[in-house]
Amino acid sequence: MGRIGDFFYHLTITILVAAALVFLLMAFKEQYPILKNQQELEDLQSNVETKKTNDNPHINWKKLKRINQDIIAWIKVPGTKIDYPILQGKEWNKYLHKNYEGDYSYAGSIFIQPGATFDDSHLIIYGHNMRVKYMFGSLHDFESENFYKKHNKIYLYQPGKTIKCT
């Protein structure tokens, strides 16, 4: 190769390396907050659940309420990563991009609308559908009939009450 060929070869390599670094930085920037939020939720789970059974876990509601008064319930879907507190703020989208402590979080929290109760005939539980199966991302597993047959229960826990949906 001549001088011009060497120049374009080195320029191409430099551009490719720079593009790869930008790609990796963007991937990290997108994934880190999600993974951080998930780690915080796992820490919360280990701090408030003292006994782990599906039908009747012992959840330390006093500890949860000290963390955030807006935590009103807990949802668990065995066989999935769905095992989260449910929050209810005064504005319907308060927890769309806030974690259970009220701090900004790209992934947000699982929440219901203000004024909604678990006694309503219809209740929408909101949460993000994350590609890495966090939050409600693992609901896609239920597209498989075999998976659904093996994991056909949803548990909603409230202080003194367990709702088992089948």
How does the language model describe each region?
Residues 1-17:
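N-terminal Sec-pathway targeting helices
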Residues 17-166:
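Solvent-exposed, non-transmembrane regions of membrane-associated and secreted proteins
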